């Protein structure tokens, strides 16, 4: 799930119930088959919970709020529900959450101006290396800052119905614009920091949402972000989504991988 920050309406000084969650990749399209060979499905037992990104044969990168002790992954999938000949399944031998991630906010779905979801990043060490094939391929980490205004591609199996939270059958893609962090700072009451990216459409209609957490944000062909959190209903005007900014974490990622071969 993308970390959805539920909007709690204030009424007469009190807090009302949150509105229905509008949960899906909004304004997206079915990804071309095998066009995202680095995209990974992350599970808790047999329940799909998040996306992820294959960095090399042994390592998957995802969001820290996707953490469960029972995580496992599937690679080479297009259809979330069907067993495909291309699919590979791996257990997770160890999880490495970024030490700066505030786990006290883990799965806390309310809004507060002091909440800071920075460092929402986790590495998963696979119990057995993935077989690198035409449909299972790693993607490189960024070496340069992303450019504002870039066209970015996000992908995921996020929910396709607003109330039943039913995940998409086929991997979905959506094109988003990389926006100034100030836009997200104005849009959300939670803290938007320099280790985050802001992406969406000012007019709304395109967004990632519940079920897309941990998946890639690829800007001008380069992996730049990991889907982290955002507003619900998803795809609202002037409510772009927030992504973990990977260029800020390449040293931690590389060091963690090197020390845990």
Curated annotation (Swiss-Prot):
Domain of life of the native organism: Eukaryota
Gene3D superfamilies (alphabetical): Trypsin-like serine proteases
Signal peptide: 1-18
CDD domains, per the entry: Tryp_SPc
Record's keyword annotation contains Disulfide bond: yes
Organism: Mus musculus
Glycosylation sites: 102
One annotated GO molecular function: serine-type endopeptidase activity
Catalysis: reaction(s): Preferential cleavage of Arg-|-Xaa bonds in small molecule substrates. Highly selective action to release kallidin (lysyl-bradykinin) from kininogen involves hydrolysis of Met-|-Xaa or Leu-|-Xaa
Protein name per Swiss-Prot or TrEMBL: Kallikrein 1-related peptidase b9
Entry's family note: Belongs to the peptidase S1 family. Kallikrein subfamily.
UniProt key word Signal: yes
Known role: Glandular kallikreins cleave Met-Lys and Arg-Ser bonds in kininogen to release Lys-bradykinin.
Maturation propeptide residues: 19-24
SMART domains: Tryp_SPc
Residues annotated as catalytic: 65 (charge relay system), 120 (charge relay system), 213 (charge relay system)
UniProt-listed Enzyme Commission number(s): 3.4.21.35
Gene encoding the protein: Klk1b9
